[in-house]
Amino acid sequence: MRGTLIVTNDFPPRQGGIQSFVHGLACLLPPGQVAVYAPAWDGAKNFDARQPFPVIRHPASLMLPVPSVGRRAAAALREHDFDTVLFGAAAPLGLLGPVLRRAGATRLVALTHGHEAGWAALPGARGLLRRIGDSVDVVTYLGEYFRSRLARVLSPQAAARMVRLAPGVDVAAFRPGPSPSAGPAGSAGAAGIRQRLGLAGSPVVVCVSRLVRRKGQDTLIRSWPSVRSVIPGARLLLVGDGPYGPDLRRLATGLGVADAVTFTGSVPAGELPGYYAAGDVFAMPCRTRRGGLDVEGLGIVYLEASAAGLPVIGGDSGGAPDAILDGETGYVVPGRSVTVLAERVGALLADPARAQAMGRRGLAWVEQEWDWSRVAGRLDAILRGTSYRPVPPGA
């Protein structure tokens, strides 16, 4: 393998889970053996200058599988003398597969995330997914939920070539400090955050996510009157920003729990470990919307929370249950059930010993299965077309 060109619409400095995933994969590849072709975005010049690999920016903020994009991708492949292409998302740029084969690519890999499940549910889009699957060597999937749905629309040959590849977690960045309230060092540490936000001494449930309907922050707020009836001092910390924010604030006021709900707004990625560590329990009761077209891909936040030593409560949407060992690292709940959510939150806040045991189990699981070092081995095997044999932890 001479090198890999990553062709993707999803790449920083644009924010999002897919963007972080694709960037993480790029950083796993050896310098000199990877380049990225991605759309223009505000702040891209400064971001690109800090990367250990070249980033070729498309002049527009969106790339479609049209001839001009195909020509630029082919030119980048030839310029770097690479023979492998990794599509950051199978749909729609995977349709460029035949063009890049003709440009010299001998191996094509297409990642899938969550939106492809929506494509699989639409008659017109199914045919495009099938074409993509037939034109690449490997289609990856996050977990069993998405594998089963994509396999139905791919050809038998393409379905047989599917391989699991999910995001990793920087466990060292999120690992708990020497005491439950210590958190990472520095001004963004848990104790400082609790003090600054008026949470010191209170039981805290934290949710780190964009404020959008699918993530279920509204269900958390609706559960809070019941939670407070069991744990009177319980506080809810909502970390992130998004279009649903004003509605959520009105909901908290209308339910009389605005004094118990703290909205942080957008938080720099480097400070997130401290916000996770400021919580006693992590909860994001995500739910499926739009008849199955809007589902959770994986929910990397559950794994980050586990790496921070927190018990997690997640919704049953899409691949979210793949990021939780139900009953061991936390609980999977019906994403729309206020009652079940309130019961699980209240039970964990009322039993710190159980919560901490689940947090320890989650940290051990993430270290064993989800560390980026594990992802690196899988990625290398997928790009080379070889078998992956994981090294046992500690070996």
What are these regions (language model features)?
Residues A260, S266, A277-V295, L310:
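Acidic donor-binding loop of glycosyltransferase active sites
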Residues L325-G327, Y331-V338, A347-A353:
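Conserved acidic donor-binding segment of nucleotide-sugar-dependent glycosyltransferases
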Residues Y145, G168:
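Carbohydrate-associated surface elements
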